[in-house]
Structures are given as structure tokens and as C-alpha cells.
Amino acid sequence: SNRAKEEYFMRKKKLLSLLLVGTMVAGLITGCGSSSKDTSKSDSGKSKGGKVVLNVINYHVGTDYAADYYKYLFDAFKKTDEGKNVEFNFEEIPTTDAFNQKIKLLISSGDLPDIVLNGGNNITALAAKSGKVQDLTQYLEDDKKWKAMFSDTDLEFNSYKGKVYGIPVSKEISYIYYNKDLFKKAGIEAPETGYATWDEFFAACDKLKAKGITPVSMDSADLGWLSKLWYSGLIGTAGKEGNDFMNKQYPTDYNTSVVEDATATLQKMLQKYTTSDALGGKYDTMATHFFNGEVAMLPNGPWMIPDFKSTDKAPEGFYDKVGIMLLPGSGMESVPTPGDMVGAKDPDKIKAAVAFLKFETSAENQIKALEMAGLQPVSSNIEVPQSLKDSDPLMADVLEVQSKAKYTYGQNQAYWYQNVIDVFSNQLPELAYG
């Protein structure tokens, strides 16, 4: 009925207006960041044994996709000339969400760790305004070989007022993983690179549903990572207007037809095509559904590939059941990543922290990160060994499919105000029940 339609659009508008409110609040909070006092003490960087002790809050622990890689990285650094005099003092926080909340808290009041690992959220400006992270511009200027590892876009993304504060350690891309067996069971032939349109994609979802298969993984807890990737794709592939919107940093007006249409489609996905525990559900649970063959498709990046081989996470042989495709309309999320920052104040600590960032982004370790954690090299001039492509066919597919994307776009966790991101994930259940 017209009345029902009217109410439906009012609910959509409500979600979008809440996003706008979130944006305005974000502006206020970001503005306040510049007045926060620097509470860090200029403590000596050396312990009694003459070692430089670097404090690090590490979320790459436990079952995190990059836990093994970061353990290797910290240990290997201590065996180098620059790191042989360095010790790490770790505080472990096991989820990115809790880590990001902690770092934001320390930016506003407290001491940041000496190395500030990136948690995926774009907090560079917030941290730079606080005066608690080091300007790294001169270190890059003094080491041209190191600077050449990064594109201008990567460094601009990690800059504030023309100064570089973050060193990006990988490139973020995402696309769709699908379960070949479930597609076969539903009588669907997967497209070579992706569905040409969202209509074709939803036709496949309907076929899966008809066979009792849940089409897609979605979530709402911990900022709703999977739901955000679908949402970014819906907007980012909606012609030039949508693509421009998803490639813009810190947009302030969400009352556009492309955002409204994407919101309506996301609502349909939450209501019709996902698991019953998606609302309030965390990423880990939704990933497990995919590993267990309970869901046909999940959007994510290459860092998930090692999990397909891990019998701690997925059944034996699961890797061979997984295929990849671009998002409908030949879309792929591709953004520069927020980089690691230096929160140290003592000169010895700063020197050691910068040396660690150089080690972390060396060509050798970018390949190691790809191999061990599925992290895409940040440097475009790095040659991926054929042996790695041969031993990891899915990763080879990922490296190949990137060139076939017609639309590349950002995702909201990287490009939107933090408060908008928070409001968005909080409103997902209301949108679904709407």
C-alpha cells in the first residue's frame, strides 16, 4: 500500500539522517582533538641493560589472521643490525574493535604506544592533531629508496596538512569469495569474473535460497565489517555518481539517491538473504558459517586465504572449494591503508621505531606478509615469486582479477568519519527490522 511505502521511505530517511548527525558529531570530536594536551612523559628509551624498549599494543594475537606473521616480524627485527638492541614490551588486545577503541582513547587522554599499529580505521588526522605522533616526512625524504616503496596516493592518504604521519604496510582490496560446491548444488554456473549486474547477482541468490542455501554472510557487531563491504560495493558500482561518492574522503551529505538505493538494497539483503544471527553477529561467527559450508558467499580480502587452509578454522580440503569473483558490475574495493605511526617521544625510541617501520615495509617482508597473512604488497613494483603463485592458486587468481575491475572504490571504514561508521553499524538491526 502507499501508506506502507511511505513509512518504509521514512525509515530509510531516518537511518540516513542519523548518519548525518553522526557526521556532524564527528566534526565536533575531530575538532576537539587539536586541543588535547600532550600527557606523554619524555622517558628515557633505554632500560638498565642498555636496550631500547619499545611499547607496542598488539592485536595480531591468538586466532588473528596475521598473528604468525607479526610474531615472525617482531622476532626477525631483533636479529637485524638496527634491531639487535631493541626489546618489545607488548600489551595484547585480541580484537581490532577493542584495539581501535583503546587507541582513540589514548589519543584523547594518555600515552600512545611507541609503535602505533594500524587497526584499519583512518585515525591519521586525529592522531596528528593531538601532537602525540611523529611527523615522518623527513625520514622518508632522507631515504629515497624507502620513499619509492609508496605511491603519492598512499602517502597523501597518511598525511595531515602536507606532513606524513603513517607508513602504509599493505594495500587493501576486497571482492567476493564463493563456495563452488554450494553453487553446483543450486545449479548455478559461477561467472568468470563476476556478475554483470546486481539483478543477476540477486537472481543467483534466489536460486541458492530455493535449494535451502543461505546466499550471503553479513554482520552488525564490531562495526559490521561484512555488511559494510556489501554496502560500499552497492554504492561504489552505482555509476559515476556512486563511484565518486565511495572514493571521497569524509563525505558529509548522505542524502543522495545512490546512498538511498544502496540502503534499500542492503535492507533487502539483511531481511532475505543472510543468516538469522547476522544481526548482533560478529565477523568471526559469520566467517565460520562460510568455512562450514552454511553460506554461499562472503565479501573479504586476500588476508582470509590462509584461513581456508587452516584446519583450526576450516574443514580439511576447504581451500579447493573456494572461488573468487568481483562484486556485481565489475566492482572491487581498493583503498590505500591507514599506516603504522610512531608514538614515541624519546629520540632513541623514535629511531628504533622508524627502523622497525622500514623493516616491516621492506620488499622481502611485503612478500612474507603476502605469503603468511595474505596481505597485498603496498608497493606496486614488487615482483611476486612464481613459486608463491603456484603454491597458492587462489592468491594467483586474486592478483589476476584486480586488473579486470571496472569500478574500484573505497570502503566506509577507511573513508568515513568514525562516528558515522559507529552509527551505521548500530543502525543495521533497526534497518533490518524496519
Predicted segments with their positions:
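Short, Lys/Arg-enriched N-terminal segments with co-localized hydrophobic residues
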Residues: S1-F9
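Conserved N-terminal structural module of periplasmic/extracytoplasmic solute-binding proteins
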Residues: R11-L19, C32-A125, K129-S130, E141-K145, ...
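C-terminal motif of bacterial Sec signal peptides marking the signal peptidase cleavage site
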Residues: G27-G31
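Extracytoplasmic/periplasmic substrate-recognition and gating elements
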Residues: K79, K84-E87, A186-E189, Q271-K272, ...
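Hinge/lid segment of periplasmic solute-binding proteins
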Residues: G119-Y175, F202, L229-S232, Y319-G323, ...
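Long, aromatic- and glycine/proline-rich binding clefts that accommodate carbohydrate-like moieties
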Residues: T153, D320-M325, L370-N426, E430
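Extracytoplasmic/periplasmic solute-binding protein
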Residues: Y160-V169, S174, K184, D199-P251, ...
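Glycine-centered hinge/linker elements that transmit conformational signals in sensory
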Residues: A203-K207, N247-G280
